[in-house]
């Protein structure tokens, strides 16, 4: 009689370290391996405490920016719909304003904003939707932004500037004026369509849907030998704090100096005005002098006539201060880029105004978090003669 040794049948293995999804039958006598993954009914609360310990940048903005004030300004300009006769009630204005700020802080589409609100805990906390069973969908976000329009976003920008003044960050030490190109999707037209558009006519074979998808306001321009298509954003920045104080928009083909007067801030405590080589003109110099401003505009060499050494040194001196205006543009680029995907100049103005507003909001929150004194005057470095005298007496 032949005896066959058989291994006794093993019961299902239900070790939570090895098989957190349920009991399984191991293949052989595998040792129990421990895992760093821990399952807890209170995992959300533990994760929330971890986030608070690490620091949530959105909560810094929520703590230091008065969104109720911003919402009040919007409600005064665009009152909420009356729902006493029925219909779904609208979302609170403070929630929608926070959503728009999130959209432009992260350069998100309306579809991505909806998804991120459903997926990200930090977005839900910032928009006061942590305990909400529903969030605004993409259509709600789009319609709300359209309802605000240029007037609503301009009011948001001005209300943010009012908060700057409330905290003492007034425009000081002069102002810097500059413009930047804001690219937009390139439009393609046939020769016949372009000829009609140049005459101010719309091709008859365009359907209403096709017309809505064609941006007829954006223009082309060339800069440093490279072609651009889109719009232009002109801003005025105060030298001391680098907040955007004035803003206006135009098309890419417009010259930088076209909107100089619109972004000139008469509320700055200093009368110094800085600008690059695209702004000098005899008429502008006379205008600034008549208004009591001190002109610091870099000179551009005429064709065939180089600048003198004195003019070159003056340009270098101005450039040290004028370079501060490039920081807001770089920060906007860091927030997701300046490319806009809207149709028409009105919507482009809304997008560019929101970019500038979000830049000021983010910078103000950082200033208040770090305790930056609005009236702090940095100590100047000692002169060479003072250094030599101190060394000789040592």
What do the predicted segments below correspond to?
Residues 2-76, 367-394:
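Charged, often Cys/His-bearing segments associated with DNA-binding zinc-finger transcription factors
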Residues 75-88:
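Short, Lys/Arg-enriched N-terminal segment that forms or immediately precedes the first helix
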Residues 286, 291-292, 311-394:
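Basic, amphipathic alpha-helical segments enriched in Lys/Arg and hydrophobic/aromatic residues
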Residues 50, 66, 87-93, 133, ...:
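Secondary-structure capping and boundary motifs in well-ordered enzyme cores
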Residues 92, 115-118, 128-129, 136-290, ...:
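Polybasic low-complexity intrinsically disordered regions
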Residues 95-107:
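Alpha-helical support elements that line or immediately flank enzyme active sites
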Residues 124-143, 295-297, 303-311:
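Phosphate-backbone recognition surface of nucleic-acid-processing proteins
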